[in-house]
Regions:
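Non-catalytic cap/lid and distal C-terminal segments of serine-dependent acyl enzymes
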Residues: 1-203
């Protein structure tokens, strides 16, 4: 996070480690990354440092796997976050749905995804799918954090991000989705980190 923006807008950054677990409460493990970030860490920061005392002042941001995690966590704990920014998000639930033991997608194998997401035959209908969480909020009329997304046009995750963008649009869920030239790299993320922080703190 650029220090000049931290000083300009007077905000603190809390950066936990998700250990390549997609920031999920691993359905096949006892790891609770989503609950930790979305509830426990927020509560700890508020009690200990007296920071981000309201959801309107609490934002969550991530890139790649962290982009998936930021969206999923914001939708799982919408009362704790005012805005979510996600860049080049690894929104791969449709890609891994139905994967069988012994299979892989060139990035990881069935065992890894099963450990993170649980039953891959039912992952599309599960709470590991951000689509399920945000649609549930929308259908019930509950608050949805403001959504900001971006992806580079040369990013290998572009179609996954476009698919999620189309899903939100079809469901009538307000969001900002931006594309521009760029790959899955720090050049793109540095640009959109600045753009999104300026946008998030512009109000």
């Amino acid at each position: 996070i650029p220090e000049d923006l931290m000083q300009k807008y007077n905000f603190a950054v809390i950066a936990p480690n998700g250990e390549n677990g997609f920031w999920l409460d691993g359905l096949s493990t006892t790891r609770k990354y989503c609950t930790f970030v979305g509830a426990e860490l927020v509560d700890y920061v508020r009690r200990t440092f007296r920071l981000a005392l309201s959801p309107e002042d609490t934002y969550i941001m991530g890139l790649s796997m962290g982009g998936f995690g930021a969206l999923h966590t914001a939708f799982a704990f919408p009362d704790n976050f005012g805005k979510v920014a996600a860049m080049s998000s690894a929104l791969i639930v449709h890609e891994i749905a139905g994967m069988k033991p012994g299979e892989d997608n060139g990035t990881a194998n069935y065992d890894y995804y099963h450990e993170c997401f649980g039953d891959l035959d039912s992952v599309l209908e599960s709470d590991s799918n951000p689509e399920v969480l945000v649609k549930r909020l929308h259908d019930s009329g509950k608050k949805i954090p403001e959504i900001l997304m971006s992806c580079g046009t040369e990013d290998f995750l572009l179609e996954h991000n476009r698919q999620f963008h189309r899903f939100l649009a079809e469901e009538g869920i307000a969001h900002t989705y931006l594309e521009s030239s760029g790959s899955h790299d720090m050049d793109f993320w540095n640009e959109y980190t600045r753009r999104f922080i300026d946008s998030m703190f512009a109000d």
